[in-house]
Amino acid sequence: GLAPIKVEGTLVEGGLKLNGSVSWASNLYPGGVIVLPVAVQNAPESHPNRYIVTVRQDVEGLSIDYHRNLLALNGTESGTLKFEDVFVPSEDVLSDNIEAFLHDVTAPFLLVQSSFCLGLAAGALQEAAKHLDVSQGVFRPEFPLILEEYQSLREELVRLASEPERAERRDLLSLRLGV
């Protein structure tokens, strides 16, 4: 399930007004777009009340408190978001049904994340292979096992990516955590 949504939306003419906060968000680069869930307070009774919206970082009413000097995380541009009467036009509502949206994007999202991680791992392994004799070769015996694990994860990624719509959530999460 989802954690409680801390940004509330109110349907207004032409879109939504947002109020609330997001304690931790990453990739808050200047000129960027933020995608977030919103709990809509006045949604029609027979209609879902949790939406997914996009907000431009320079929109009026949005303040960002950047978390600077985080060990190894400075490049993530992370921070806390505060929304005060931020207007989101109707065309910036990605979905008015968060469950359906998450169902549709979870597999591709986790597969892309896993691909990035495996690509990084492949580069690291390629470079590490050049230095197996450093420190009297202490890591040489482990290297084939690490390569085998990498290859297994890569094969699982290819298998899941061949039919993402059929991929089980458990398998996607296991792959993502494995890399």
Task: List the predicted regions and their residue ranges.
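A short core secondary-structure module
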Residues: 24-62
